[in-house]
Amino acid sequence: MEFVVFEPGEKYQRKNRKWQGIPGIERTPDGILWVTWYSGGHGEGPDNYVIVVCSKDGGKTWSKPLLAIDPPDDIRAFDPCLWVSPDGKLHLFWSMSKNWWDGIGGVWTMVAEKNIQGDLVWSKPSRIADGIMMNKP
């Protein structure tokens, strides 16, 4: 299932988002602020996706969306959370479920690490648990 968008286009830009919910924020050891939330559609439902942006100047300015989690069909992505683990890695968690809640939805994660060139590289997404998670581990 391909649902990670590494170069979010027009659909994910501010002018096309009617609402935003469940924000999360984290600061990585290099001082960068990372923010996530979910949006899409006219409220909770199958058009929901997760967005990630960052600020390198303490929150004065923000990047365009750097990453979107946008599942296909009637599966929604929601309730994202960011966490920096003790080893300094940035983790993104989110839930996915069919429509509102299908009883078998789950929590997913991706981990970002800097490569040898200093660029941030995200791992492949993986499902880690059943249910929903709205707080840091």
Q: What does each of the following model-derived ranges do?
A:
Residues 1-137:
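Asp-box/BNR beta-propeller blade signature and adjacent active/binding-site loops
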